[in-house]
């Protein structure tokens, strides 16, 4: 019979059990909901890959990740389970437990009867934790299994004579395996020691542990295995010296080769000796021999592996570094130039004289007429004000490109630099934020703008394509599909930006005016995922936490859901093994709007190559990482209407091999399309990427020096020029100085960003589209800011990817030109006046323009009202670059007048303000030359008139006629080109 006290405990026990079951139920519910979310995300991700025709790539990647996880987990589980089984097998059959062994007694009472279950659970849990890190190695695993060999004369590293592919494809995964194996053995050894203690094989009766003989055998074998794994690690560490950053340059330098390499070899043999000692100790009593072996190992690791190399570096290398490091500097130079794609840069000299003649100025009117009057970074508000048409439209990015304008009467026309932007919907500015508005009605942007960067009408841009519905001027390309479902910089981003197309709710195309009803449309493409059954709808409703998808009668089985609509996010999701540029840009091709995104293959394992300087890159650039190898071998092209994505292998354009891309093409056959299959209308708009040239220019400034001693002394080393800035004149970037680790003063000036320009490259006969950046000599604190050279990257199909450096005499560089502009009284007075009269001044980016054998700089001067802030182009600044204070500044209300201010030549337009002409500008010319100049002036004047009027067909014809006259003028005057070295 129960006592009253026992009866009183029953309700309390029942209540506690009830609360426990409630907690368990809540936990199970939370896990279930989380699992549903995970499963829904997993399933809908697969549907997304299927929608862009990459389902096979998704499956392959999933199988690899799952295989790595379960493979490493199974391996760890088996080894640990066997070891714990051995522990149970070696447990003493009889054990006298003292008072201090209470923990062991309880363990044996409660756990020993369930030893197999406990062993299995522990092995499973620890194995799953240990294997989780293997999932992230999928990239290295795929490169390991499918990596191809490098070919060519520099295919082997100079130290170990192994193919470079070994370092890029094999070494990273092998290093992971060795590291994982060693850490796993350490974890297993700890678990085994604990298990032996709980089983009584290890006793600590009075503070001095005792180990049973059979336990010593077990632990000795485990420790020997750890020593063997460490030995393999030392072998791999030898190869990793090729990536060392301990010397003057990256790679195995003198101390690495003559001190660290022998030390690693010695440590390899000592680790093998330690393994043998541990196995020999199985038949000996005590641990004296293993302790001696491990102690010797630690002593050698410290003395030979750390202290000895430090002594060699300090005593032998540092006093004679310029002599001892020369062979290794030579290796670093060759590897870096090859790995970063700057080993085939063409070098030319550019005289940069101030001797332009009148015929030369006129002969270069195609270049002067193509300077960018409209800087997309500063004038974006102007384009938005004039062309957004509705508050909910925005131009999230403006890009610089070039387009061919057709001429009349069969004339070939001409190429014009264009500012290009796509009109996208900004969700945050919609008239209403309801679910229907956000996801069903305002689903897409509409149309694009194409505006000549070299033309202005009433201080505002001219437009080749504008308005809604889209209008194309004569001679300009036509848009047949203006709807934009996929774009850049989606304001919401992620899953929140999904839209539904082809629903019962008409989608808004555009509203021509506030008094008119919106024009609507229905989607007829195959973009996104079709909601064709109950399970697909349910999965997306769970993923987004939005059950309107499930219950709305506006959504049908034909509706298509688009939920990854940012171009960069799409590419990152589809090809996570590539790195991506910071600046996708739109292209109009065949009446369709496409987005082009540059993609890179990168590595930080190229032997002897220096890590790239990426400090000047935008924060969202995929090249913002540790890398010492890069290739722009892929162009991603996305249709703005359908979202269909193509990855084009463009390595054939630059005629450079890319073994990393070749490897990914083996891994994912059919994913990459040869550039030969890219439509010609798209190929015509490929650009050399800014991010890549930013990295290459930063490195080439030093690595154009190929003599090791000159490289060591930094003789003739260059930096990318300090930026001249842009925007408000009073926001000039401040110059600050810091001291580096060698005690030298370094400047923290921002560097000049590359600029796309359409101009006649010295030595060429016609303008081409190029990416340009400038060099200045390396100096303490950037105190020397004269130009040292100009790097030009070709973007036209005929010279795509060709890098040319024009070395110049010490003429004023961009920062000095900026100072000259600020010191010009006409400019500074105008800025002061405008900034105090209800307006403000914005300066565009400074452009470097080679003209003949001279160098010009151009900068647009915008004025915006404080009450209606969108910039208008009011003034033009042109600088004729000289040296030591001889640069001349032209400033006027038209480009023609500013040029006349410099050259005192007869140009179409206004009369100049009359400054003293530069040397040679008044040379007498023959009557024939004068007639050609007059004809060129007439043709140029007519071309500008047609351009401002938006008659692009006539403009193309005018430009073609002008080119013919200019060719005659060049022949008549013998205009010189640059000399080559």
Language model features with spans:
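Soluble extracytoplasmic regions of secretory-pathway and membrane proteins
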Residues: 3-13, 19, 25-50, 54-949, ...
């Amino acid at each position: 019979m129960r006592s009253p006290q026992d009866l009183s405990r029953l309700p309390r026990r029942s209540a506690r059990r009830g609360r426990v079951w409630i907690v368990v139920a809540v936990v199970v519910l939370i896990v279930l909901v989380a699992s549903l979310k995970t499963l829904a995300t997993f399933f809908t991700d697969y549907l997304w890959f299927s929608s862009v025709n990459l389902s096979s790539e998704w499956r392959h990647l999933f199988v690899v990740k799952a295989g790595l996880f379960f493979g490493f987990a199974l391996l760890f589980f088996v080894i640990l389970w066997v070891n714990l089984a051995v522990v149970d097998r070696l447990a003493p059959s009889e054990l006298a437990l003292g008072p201090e062994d209470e923990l062991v007694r309880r363990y044996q009472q409660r756990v020993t009867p369930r030893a197999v279950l406990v062993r299995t659970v522990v092995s499973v849990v620890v194995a799953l934790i240990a294997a989780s890190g293997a999932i992230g190695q999928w990239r290295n695993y795929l490169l390991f299994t499918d990596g191809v060999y490098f070919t060519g004369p520099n295919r082997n590293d100079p130290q170990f004579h192994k193919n470079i592919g070994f370092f890029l494809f094999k070494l990273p995964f092998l290093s992971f395996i060795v590291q994982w194996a060693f850490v796993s053995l350490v974890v297993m050894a700890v678990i085994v020691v604990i298990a032996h203690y709980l089983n009584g094989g290890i006793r600590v009766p009075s503070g001095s542990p005792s180990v049973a003989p059979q336990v010593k055998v077990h632990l000795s074998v485990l420790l020997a295995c750890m020593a063997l794994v460490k030995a393999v690690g030392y072998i791999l560490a030898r190869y990793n010296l090729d990536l060392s950053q301990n010397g003057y340059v990256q790679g195995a330098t003198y101390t690495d080769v003559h001190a660290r390499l022998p030390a690693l070899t010695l440590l390899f043999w000592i680790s093998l000796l330690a393994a043998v000692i541990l196995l020999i100790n199985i038949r000996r009593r005590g641990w004296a021999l293993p302790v001696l072996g491990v102690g010797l190992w630690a002593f050698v690791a410290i003395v030979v592996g750390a202290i000895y190399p430090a002594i060699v570096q300090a005593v032998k290398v540092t006093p004679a570094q310029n002599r001892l490091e020369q062979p290794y500097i030579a290796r670093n130079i060759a590897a870096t130039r090859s790995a970063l794609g700057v080993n085939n840069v063409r070098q030319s000299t550019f005289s940069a004289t101030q001797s332009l003649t009148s015929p030369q100025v006129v002969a270069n009117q195609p270049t002067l007429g193509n300077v960018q009057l409209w800087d997309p970074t500063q004038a974006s508000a102007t384009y938005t004000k004039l062309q957004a048409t509705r508050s909910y439209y925005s131009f999230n990015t403006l890009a610089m490109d070039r387009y061919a304008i057709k001429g009349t009467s069969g004339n070939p026309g001409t190429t014009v630099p264009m500012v290009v932007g796509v009109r996208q919907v900004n969700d945050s500015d919609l008239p209403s934020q309801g679910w229907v508005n956000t996801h069903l009605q305002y689903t897409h942007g509409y149309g694009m703008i194409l505006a000549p960067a070299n033309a202005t009408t009433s201080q505002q841009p001219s437009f080749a394509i504008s308005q809604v519905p889209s209008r194309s001027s004569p001679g300009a390309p036509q848009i047949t599909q203006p709807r934009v479902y996929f774009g850049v910089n989606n304001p919401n981003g992620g899953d929140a930006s999904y839209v539904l197309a082809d629903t019962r709710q008409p989608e808004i195309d555009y509203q021509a005016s506030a008094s008119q009803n919106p024009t609507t449309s229905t989607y007829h493409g195959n973009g996104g995922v079709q909601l064709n059954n109950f399970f697909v709808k349910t999965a997306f409703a769970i993923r987004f936490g939005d059950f309107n998808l499930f219950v709305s009668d506006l959504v049908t089985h034909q509706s298509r859901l688009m939920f990854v609509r940012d171009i960069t996010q799409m590419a990152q999701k589809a090809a996570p093994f590539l790195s991506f540029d910071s600046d996708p840009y739109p292209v109009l091709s065949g009446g369709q709007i496409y987005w082009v995104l540059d993609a890179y293959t990168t590595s930080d394992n190229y032997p002897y190559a220096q890590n790239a300087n990426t400090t000047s890159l935008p924060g969202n650039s995929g090249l913002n990482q540790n890398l010492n190898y890069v290739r722009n071998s892929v162009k991603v092209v996305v249709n703005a209407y359908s979202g269909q994505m193509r990855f084009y292998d463009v390595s054939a354009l630059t005629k450079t091999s890319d073994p990393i891309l070749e490897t990914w093409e083996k891994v994912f056959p059919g994913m990459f399309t040869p550039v030969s299959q890219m439509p010609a209308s798209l190929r015509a708009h490929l650009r050399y990427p800014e991010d890549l040239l930013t990295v290459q220019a930063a490195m080439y400034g030093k690595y154009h020096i190929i003599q090791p001693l000159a490289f060591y002394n930094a003789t003739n080393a260059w930096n990318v020029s300090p930026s001249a800035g842009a925007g408000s004149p009073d926001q000039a970037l401040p110059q600050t100085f810091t001291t580096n680790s060698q005690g030298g003063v370094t400047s923290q000036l921002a560097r000049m960003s590359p600029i796309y320009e359409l101009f006649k490259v010295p030595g060429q006969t016609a303008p081409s589209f190029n990416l340009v950046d400038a060099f200045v000599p390396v100096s303490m604190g950037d105190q020397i800011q004269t130009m040292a050279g100009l790097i030009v990257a070709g973007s036209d199909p005929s010279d795509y990817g060709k890098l040319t450096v024009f070395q110049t005499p010490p003429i004023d560089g961009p920062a000095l030109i900026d100072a000259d502009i600020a010191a010009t009284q006409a400019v500074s007075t105008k800025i002061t006046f405008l900034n105090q009269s209800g307006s403000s001044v914005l300066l565009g980016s400074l452009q470097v323009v080679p003209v003949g054998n001279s160098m010009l700089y151009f900068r647009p001067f915008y004025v915006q009202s404080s009450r209606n802030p969108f910039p208008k182009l009011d003034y033009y600044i042109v600088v004729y670059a000289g040296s030591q204070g001889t640069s001349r500044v032209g400033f006027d209300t038209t480009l023609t007048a500013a040029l006349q201010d410099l050259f005192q030549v007869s140009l179409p337009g206004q009369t100049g303000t009359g400054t003293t002409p530069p040397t040679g500008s008044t040379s007498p010319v023959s009557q024939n030359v004068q007639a050609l100049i007059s004809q060129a002036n007439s043709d140029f004047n007519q071309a500008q008139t047609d351009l401002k009027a938006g008659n692009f067909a006539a403009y193309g014809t005018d430009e073609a006629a002008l080119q013919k006259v200019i060719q005659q003028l060049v022949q008549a005057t013998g205009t010189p080109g640059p000399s080559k070295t």
